[in-house]
Amino acid sequence: RLSSRLCERSEAIQEKKQTNLTSNFTKNNYIKNIEKILDYLNSGDIFQTNFTHKYITQKKSNLSDQHIYLNFRHKTTTPFSAYLNFSDICICSYSPERFIKIIDNKVITSPIKGTIKKSSDRAKDHKLIKKLKESKKNLAENLMIVDVLRNDISRICKKGSVKVKELATIKSYRNVHHLVSTITGKMNKNIDVIDVLGATLPGGSVTGAPKIRAMEVISELEKSNRGVYCGAIGYISFSQDADFNIPIRTVTIFNDQISINCGGGIVSDSKPESEFQESIDKI
């Protein structure tokens, strides 16, 4: 029934739009925090970190949680979406990013690093794709996170089995283009899904490099914890296969309050104004 409703483009849903989002950072404060991250980067304390801010609004009384999910779902074509409705909290995820897939004892991870907004003009859009592919800054971000994830899955994979299958490949969605890499490995004997998640959470693409220090910087500068955002949503089968996303582009509804985080990776040649705009483009 939900599948059929996802295909409906009903006027009722289109009319029930949720607006008036308020960030927990002003633009100036967001930029100042990026400048502080740049100080850490320039001192060699970190090489990259993922910095985000949170938008909050009150849910309109005439909107059900399902309507909110469907309304956004009409506007996205992301492959790793999820709708989780519990008694006290609802999670509507429109993630384009696979975190971990396990099939036949093979581990697959596909980090996203590098984003540019799409254009409805085809010629201009081709130029934007070219700009993204040739961006040294975005490629540097992608390469660093590939190294982080290679290291993470090497802890639970057979020696010599970890391979980069795709490096900084363009993947296009309705509103943005991304640079996506894919790393694979063969799991060691006596390793299960929980071991894999323990070795890889939180995802390298939403923390930074080196991972632990990047997480400390995030904890210092972000005003609130991320909740499910940037964690993992997925399933584990009886055969021990699994598939998890990283819940970016994710709406959380709690006590009739809607929140959505957005941000991006910061490296030494990041431009604070551009980073702020990229975070907005992802909403």
Predicted regions and their residues:
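Extended alpha-helical targeting/anchoring segments
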Residues: 1-6, 10-283
